[in-house]
Amino acid sequence: MNINVAELLNGNYILLLFVVLTLGLCLGKLRLGSIQLGNSIGVLVVSLLLGQQHFSINTDALNLGFMLFIFCVGVEAGPNFFSIFFRDGKNYLMLALVMVGSALVIALGLGKLFGWDIGLTAGMLAGSMTSTPVLVGAGDTLRHSGMESRQLSLALDNLSLGYALTYLIGLVSLIVGARYLPKLQHQDLQTSAQQIARERGLDTDANRKVYLPVIRAYRVGPELVAWTDGKNLRELGIYRQTGCYIERIRRNGILANPDGDAVLQMGDEIALVGYPDAHARLDPSFRNGKEVFDRDLLDMRIVTEEVVVKNHNAVGKRLAQLKLTDHGCFLNRVIRSQIEMPIDDNVVLNKGDVLQVSGDARRVKTIADRIGFISIHSQVTDLLAFCAFFVIGLMIGMITFQFSTFSFGMGNAAGLLFAGIMLGFMRANHPTFGYIPQGALSMVKEFGLMVFMAGVGLSAGSGINNGLGAIGGQMLIAGLIVSLVPVVICFLFGAYVLRMNRALLFGAMMGARTCAPAMEIISDTARSNIPALGYAGTYAIANVLLTLAGTIIVMVWPGLG
């Protein structure tokens, strides 16, 4: 039996789509030295090659892919998006604006200089910034621009071509820049990170190990009674001195949870909760009494929960003001915009931040109710909210504003982005509304992006050979300029205008470029995870600004002559 693969793929759009995705994802696993190609470029390369053989896909699949992707970008940005505008994130907002704005202006200038059309120019901007949101925003705006069919088809093909030719240039140049730019400035990144650590009482170890608290029990002996000197637990400040707290006391056979007025007496049996190293450092006065192995005394339910910051008495407060340890709870992690932050007593909490807290189940529940809510332990997505806000986003995208002879519409990209932000923001404020497990959100976002990349590659593949011959050299030069010059401008602005700490500044610059591989290099150079503070500060807002940049470049292009 003979199987004509070409006819089989051309006759089945779904099969073709998943063949492209499978081959592209395999290609994306390849590494060039320390650089991995990545899923996006793998799928794009495979789709361009198959596009040269005149394979094509239904445009509805392409549109659905980009819609899912941009909506999920908004959902991820939502919890922290508004805090960037309304509080101490103004420096991060300004850095993101400088990075995206300078790249947009430079791309427009180079596009006019080389005589390109809007498709090549917008594609070059998206590729050089390694930003699929730019590509998505520009593509959607082009489709709603009113161009005649043939001109629109050429612009969309050139959009994909420009992106494909400059993506690797943008990625490699930024990674090289992240490795060497810190060495070209006068301040050592490791020293800058240590300075922040000293000022804020941070652990600078990027690979800090997290342990669960353990419980051990001791019988109070004469040494411990002498050590307490008749003071109650509040006056002693047990946690400050030992790193452990007394969870239970058995006295005369009666088991009780002590309050701050309790005074230890000879023969008491006490249950201490703390990290393993805190137990190891206990004063000998504790260990001189006999260790007790009592099931009832040691029977505590130690849990670890993810607590979402929501309530007004926690939002805007510093981490130290929560006094978690005074309530018998231990903080393991602080996560903002899916980025793990250093545990810093001076970190100001934003609505939607996630604190991973360990301790007795009752105490953790109490602290969670005080600062927000415990994240739902469910793998069930609120599909009703997801679909409803998706519809709202599409309807917002249909709105058109008319000014004399000029009309302006938000388009699907901006509408879905806004609706996604609102869903993410509302989820951060209402624990039972709009829940989407992070794994599900990441899967939908990644799948939507891959479908979109497959579609644009197949549609642009037929013209890539001509494009490479005519504009390959120009694209290389333009890609390097748009990738690196905004980074230098952003550095100068942050270092000499905003006067930011260099470790935070370089982290924020990589966040403004939404480039995780470059961020890892900055953290390695600083030998600290402190740059993650800056990365998280700009990441959410940069994703939104990059999408808008794709829309803006298409809108302003006709007016430049």
Swiss-Prot record:
Query: Sorted alphabetically, which InterPro entries does this protein's record hold?
Result: AAE_transporter (IPR050144), RCK_C (IPR006037), RCK_C_sf (IPR036721), Transp_YbjL_put (IPR023017), YidE_YbjL (IPR006512)
Q: Which PROSITE patterns match?
A: RCK_C
Keyword match Cytoplasm: no
| SUPFAM superfamilies, per the entry | TrkA C-terminal domain-like (SSF116726)
Specify whether Hydrolase is a keyword of the entry.
no
The portions of this protein that span the membrane are 8-28, 32-52, 66-86, 94-114, 158-178, 383-403, 406-426, 451-471, 475-495, 540-560
Key words of the record = Cell membrane, Membrane, Repeat, Transmembrane, Transmembrane helix, Transport
Location(s), subcellular: Cell membrane
GO MF terms held by the record: monoatomic cation transmembrane transporter activity
Membrane topology category: Multi-pass membrane protein
GO biological process, alphabetically ordered: potassium ion transport
Cellular-component GO terms for this entry = plasma membrane
Residue ranges constituting the RCK C-terminal domain according to the UniProt record: 200-288, 292-373
Any single Pfam family the record assigns to this protein: TrkA_C
- Which HAMAP family does this UniProt record tie to the protein? YbjL (MF_01015)
Q: Which family does it belong to?
A: Belongs to the AAE transporter (TC 2.A.81) family. YbjL subfamily.
Protein name per its UniProtKB record: Putative transport protein YbjL
Which species is the source of this protein? Answer: Shigella sonnei (strain Ss046)
Annotated gene: ybjL
